[in-house]
Amino acid sequence: MRRSRPHSFYVLSVLFGLFVLFLYGPMLCVYLLSFQGPTGGTSFPMRGVSLVWYQTLFEGGRGVGDLGNAFWRSMRMCVIVAAFSTVIAVAAGMAYRRKFMGSNFIFYTAIISMVVPGIFVGFGIALTLGLMGLKSDWWYSGVGSQLTWSLPFGLLIMFIVLGRFNPAYEEAATDLGATARQRFLYVILPIVLPGVIGITMAGFTSSYDESARSALNMGTGNTMPMELTALLGAATTPAMFAVGTLTTLFMFALVIGTLLLVGRIAKRRQLSLTRQQPA
């Protein structure tokens, strides 16, 4: 006989449903309003349904500013920040497998930027560059400011991944005569690769969304979030909603592609282990 659910289950279910509605309801409004008609505004009711604001976005029409250049600038920064975050996090994770002098100090120095307000970090970087007589530009001061946000997450992910790594695999490779380079490339890296991909994804997405730290360090160009913030103070059109919809689709595609890649890697590893088992 099936047991009836307690009343608390239904209460918690309603609360969870309200939370999901509160979280995703505004996003749904943004997606709907992006299909507003040519005479429509940035609020309901809908005045027709069309793709005119997507067309305006790609043709550089009214109310879209310099979104094209801002988008590609953000993409370049995302790739650079993700690459630096991945390489530094993996190197630091390998180094922290053994204790060394000053390891705790270096760790907390790297992590503390997560809790320091981003605007103060960005202001400190801009002030330091000014004292050195250097002008801000996206490719060094902008990237550096965003690394103070993305790198701590990469470090924490890598420490967790390597903390679960079984050293017996590395010891077996050593017994078979593998060098340090071979152990890393053919034993350690394939096992921790899903975590490394996670670090790359975290670095990419955190860089794309970051604006507080890089606002004072971008030089003459804006990133996508900065350009959108600037446009919100001007005459706002549903083109902003079209940008939000396309950005969401792009990020979903990126996440799904990453999950498929990680799943394929895990499947190949499982097949490799199955073939190595004795009959």
PLM regions: where:
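Transmembrane alpha-helices
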Residues: 14-27, 155-158, 166-167, 180-209
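Membrane-interfacial helix termini and adjacent extracytoplasmic/periplasmic loops
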Residues: 44-45, 104, 119-150, 181, ...
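N-terminal signal-anchor/first transmembrane alpha helix
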Residues: 1-33
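Interhelical loop and adjacent transmembrane-helix boundary motif
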Residues: 2-9, 41, 51-65, 207-265, ...
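Transmembrane-helix boundary motif in ABC transporter permease subunits
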Residues: 1-7, 79-110, 123, 127-131, ...
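Loop-to-helix entry region at the N-terminal start of transmembrane alpha-helices
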Residues: 69-73, 128-157, 193-195, 243
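A structural signal for multi-pass alpha-helical bundles of membrane permease subunits
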Residues: 24-39, 73, 122-137, 201-209, ...
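Membrane-embedded alpha-helices of multi-pass transport/permease systems
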Residues: 25-28, 32, 87-91, 123, ...
